Amino acid sequence: MDYFTLFGLPARYTVDREQLASCYQELQRQFHPDRFASQPEREKTLALQQAVTINDGYQTLKHPLKRAEYMLSLHGFDLANEQHTMNDNAFLMEQLMLREELECIADKANPEVALADFAARLNGMIKTRSQLMVQQLDEQQWEQAADTVRKLRFLDKLQQQVEQLEERLLDDF
């Protein structure tokens, strides 16, 4: 059973987060291992496995990029385990330049302002690519969506580096 079916959701990228959370809580109540403490070992094991599946499914569907990767996996694109190399040289060059720019921010006269500007530009890039990804997934353009998700992974990692630098700058302040 796929995660969308498990949570009673249509198999599409846009999910009703309230319905997801509500169903998650209900499934957690039904399959909580404590409810099976007095059951035979086999029942306990099955309940524990189901609880793990419920948690994994919830975390996957809750996180936008993981949800997109999961949808693609349902259509034969296993991005989580692939050794695919990026063929978009322009995108790769842009990533190199962005990473170099980020590395230089801490040495600037006003690094907080420079980082805020950088983060705003990065958020714009992520928003644009995310909108494209949603459209591609909705239109079942799996190959194109997979390529966009690969690019979003780069941007997501860069955003994590921005957050780390922000924390370092705050610690130094």
From Swiss-Prot:
GO terms for molecular function: ATPase activator activity; protein-folding chaperone binding. Pfam families: HSCB_C. Coiled coil: none annotated. It comes from the Bacteria. InterPro entries: DnaJ_domain (IPR001623), HscB (IPR004640), HscB_C_sf (IPR036386), HscB_oligo_C (IPR009073), J_dom_sf (IPR036869). One of its GO terms (biological process) is [2Fe-2S] cluster assembly. SUPFAM superfamilies: Chaperone J-domain (SSF46565), HSC20 (HSCB), C-terminal oligomerisation domain (SSF47144). Residues 2-74 form the J domain. GO terms for cellular component: iron-sulfur cluster transfer complex. HAMAP family: HscB. Co-chaperone involved in the maturation of iron-sulfur cluster-containing proteins. Seems to help targeting proteins to be folded toward HscA. Interacts with HscA and stimulates its ATPase activity. Interacts with IscU. Belongs to the HscB family. This is Co-chaperone protein HscB.
